[in-house]
Amino acid sequence: MANQRIRIRLKAFDHRLIDQSAREIVETAKRTGAHVKGPIPLPVKKEKFTILISPHVNKDARDQYEIRTHKRLMDIIDPTDKTVDALMKLDLAAGVDVQIKLY
């Protein structure tokens, strides 16, 4: 797999889970002999929701909620076959979304 690159993008609501998963991926890739760039923190997406808490009147009574989506980006340069196998067998936390692309 010479001159190839694997780009891994992680998404999660909890920053501790995403950092732990990124550490595991970096350790696995380095252990198998690949070079890693990252993890690069991408901007946090904040979604805010405003909900009326009164069922009928009192428009002033509202609650606001916020969901933060944390993202990390990593590039694995010149991965070996061992690297790909180790990444496929890696068991990450349940709250982390992983997207893998080959370039």
From Swiss-Prot:
InterPro entries: Ribosomal_uS10, Ribosomal_uS10_dom, Ribosomal_uS10_dom_sf. The keyword Ribosomal protein applies. It comes from the Bacteria. GO terms for molecular function: structural constituent of ribosome; tRNA binding. Pfam families: Ribosomal_S10. Gene3D superfamilies: Ribosomal protein S10 domain (3.30.70.600). One of its GO terms (cellular component) is ribosome. SUPFAM superfamilies: Ribosomal protein S10 (SSF54999). The keyword Ribonucleoprotein applies. GO terms for biological process: translation. Keywords: Ribonucleoprotein, Ribosomal protein. Part of the 30S ribosomal subunit. NCBIfam families: PRK00596.1, rpsJ_bact. HAMAP family: Ribosomal_uS10. Belongs to the universal ribosomal protein uS10 family. Involved in the binding of tRNA to the ribosomes. This is Small ribosomal subunit protein uS10. The gene is rpsJ.
